[in-house]
Regions:
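Phosphate-handling active-site elements
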Residues: 50-55, 84-93
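DPxDG-like acidic metal-binding loop motif
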Residues: 59-89
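A general structural signal for well-ordered alpha-helical segments in protein cores
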Residues: 36, 40, 79, 154-158
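Oxyanion-binding and handling regions
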Residues: 1-18, 22, 91-190
């Protein structure tokens, strides 16, 4: 089993290569605009480090959101092209799954930009609801119960992808998960 997994939904870029029981990973801060220039060279470096050629990938995974609109589009587009070219099986991962990894309950929060927040309620290890919280309403969030970080994103992504692979939890098409309209869509409504 050779699987490439990518997360471009936040200011941290993460790429993981799973090859049987081995894991190779690269994860670093890129800010708000570094994903597009780094994704393909980083994937190439990671594959070279693992001694795996693109054509040998059995699976490809991507975090589909929520998160940065541009980041989501970059990650989904890049891995979709690879999946089409290789015929690799596709695994979609939700950003909240990464935050929920190894947790049982609480409120998960992701920076939505401009002071807004994407939230999810976690009960018994399952996400039971999600919500987009505007800046003006963020004061109502239960600060003492909010989780904004998980264990290592590499660890969470590695384990979630391995589990989905074992469960044959594949998708035909990567669907970006946006919890709100893009800035351009919101501007067109004015």
């Amino acid at each position: 089993m050779k699987i490439l997994a990518v997360d471009t939904t936040s200011t941290t870029f993460t790429a993981v290569l799973i090859d049987g029981d081995k894991t190779f990973a690269k994860s670093f801060e890129v800010g708000k605009s570094g994903h597009s220039s780094l994704i393909l060279p980083t994937i190439a470096d990671l594959l070279a480090e693992g001694g795996v050629e693109v054509k040998d990938l059995d699976g490809i995974a991507v975090v589909v959101g929520p998160g940065s609109f541009t980041g989501i589009r970059i990650g989904v587009s890049a891995v979709t092209a690879i999946a089409y070219g290789t015929g690799a099986k596709r695994i979609a991962v939700n950003s909240f799954e990464l935050l929920a990894y190894s947790r049982e309950s609480g409120v998960l929060a992701i920076d939505a930009g401009h002071g807004h927040t994407y939230t999810a309620k976690l009960e018994n290890g399952k996400i039971v609801s999600t919500e987009f919280v505007e800046e003006k309403d963020s004061a109502t969030l239960p600060k003492d119960k909010i989780t904004t970080t998980s264990c290592s994103v590499v660890t969470a992504l590695d384990n979630i992808v391995r589990t989905k692979w074992a469960e044959n939890n594949f998708v035909k098409v990567f669907e970006p998960y946006y919890m709100r309209k893009s800035q351009a869509e919101r501007n067109n409504e004015i």
